[in-house]
Design a protein with these regions (language model features):
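Helical "lid/coupling" subdomains associated with nucleotide-phosphate turnover
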Residues: 1-15, 30-200
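Acidic, divalent-metal-coordinating active-site segment for phosphoryl/phosphodiester hydrolysis
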Residues: 24-30
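Catalytic cores of RNA-modifying enzymes
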Residues: 19-21
């Protein structure tokens, strides 16, 4: 499991489901400790899905979105089957910039006072925004909160992937973690450096 979310939420945070989407792949990990019980990656990144399954113009109607969703579900199917079923809800955490952008756009609510930059995005909020966002030309999306120029073209594709993996794993809401892979790499380096300097 990416170490950054585990450090951010604390080692007693329980079972974490960590979702990270990049341009080319979607990575999902689940576990209760630093090492994940399951950690998988599939070729369903925001950029890849946009290029392969959405109109070149960047604008998509309901039929386009449903066709893209069907393709995404096929890609996600092996991943979903690998995750154990449980009656206990998982603490779902999103770590990527795409997820943070979507959460800001969707109006994610703040929770747990005292924790910096903590926000929650529900699947209903995400699904409410996706068709509206898809109907807007990419060059006009930067006027919306949370949509940065480098993600304006692929944010719909990323949103579809996040929506589909949340539905498949029965995740109703996702907490946005301000730390991502880069911070996790730094933490691992600091741990290794500290052990080396201290001789253990």
């Amino acid at each position: 499991m990416d170490e950054a979310p585990r450090r951010w939420y604390g080692w007693d945070a329980g079972r974490l489901l960590v979702i990270d989407i990049g341009g080319g792949s979607l990575e999902v990990a689940m576990g209760s400790d630093e090492d994940p019980t399951v950690a998988l990656s599939v070729p369903a990144g925001a950029g890849r899905v946009t290029r392969e399954f959405l109109p070149e113009s960047g604008v998509a109607d309901d039929d386009d979105l449903e066709a893209a969703r069907k393709n995404i579900r096929k890609i996600l199917e092996p991943m979903v089957k690998s995750f154990p079923k449980s009656k206990h809800p998982m603490h779902a955490v999103g770590t990527s910039k795409t997820i943070r952008s979507l959460a800001r756009l969707a109006g994610a609510v703040m929770r747990q006072p005292g924790r910096v930059d903590t926000s929650i995005m529900t699947i209903d909020q995400l699904e409410d925004w996706l068709p509206r966002l898809a109907a807007i030309a990419p060059d006009q999306r930067t006027a919306l909160p949370g949509v940065t120029p480098e993600r304006t073209y692929q944010i719909v594709g990323g949103g579809l992937v996040i929506d589909e993996i949340m539905k498949a794993l029965d995740v109703k809401e996702i907490e946005i973690c301000p730390w991502a892979l880069r911070e996790g790499a730094i933490l691992r380096w600091l741990d290794q450096f500290g052990r080396t300097r201290l001789g253990f």
